[in-house]
Amino acid sequence: MDTPVILFGAFDRHNFGDMLFPHVAAAMLPDREPIFAGLAERDLRAEGGHRVEALSAVAAWLGERPATLIHVGGEILSCDAWQAAVMLAPPGEAQRLVARLDARPHEQREWAARMLGTDARAPYATAARAAFRGPLRIAYLAVGGVELDACDEALRAEVLAALAAADDVSVRDRRTQAQLQAAGIAARLAPDRQ
């Protein structure tokens, strides 16, 4: 039995650009049938996306079996839990949440942790390792973090630790690559023809 491959990213929301990433990543794995996972379960097939499983459900289903998880594209390195949770909320609710909690960072973090089921500060970039009980190979494919240097120190430290522990890292822009290199993390530029 092949080790399951999980494509994980911010394609669990209605954003056309983010919904393209798993199509490209799946095409790079022609002999595999990847599992598409996000922070939330969504069925975006009607919009050209995928049926996306919640990461926590995929981890529970796999139990202690080994897996490979590929973080797929997007500006996930600097996307904090509050931003991720608001993006996953229904549009009307998102506007009310922002109005109510905009100047309350502590309450934002508490609400986001409840909504997402994780305390990760940058959940699209760092929640995977803690979710799985079995051996997990982790790769980052063409991820971005142009604003990582502007994020708070705790988020930056969490992201850099996750990247340092990864089996492979590629980024989508030179600025992110330079920031990671300055932190001692080697990251290839993908696509590599830029």
Set out the residue ranges of the language-model regions:
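A short beta-strand/loop micro-motif in the catalytic core of glycosyltransferases
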Residues: 167-171
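Helix N-cap/beta->alpha junction signal
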Residues: 18, 173-174
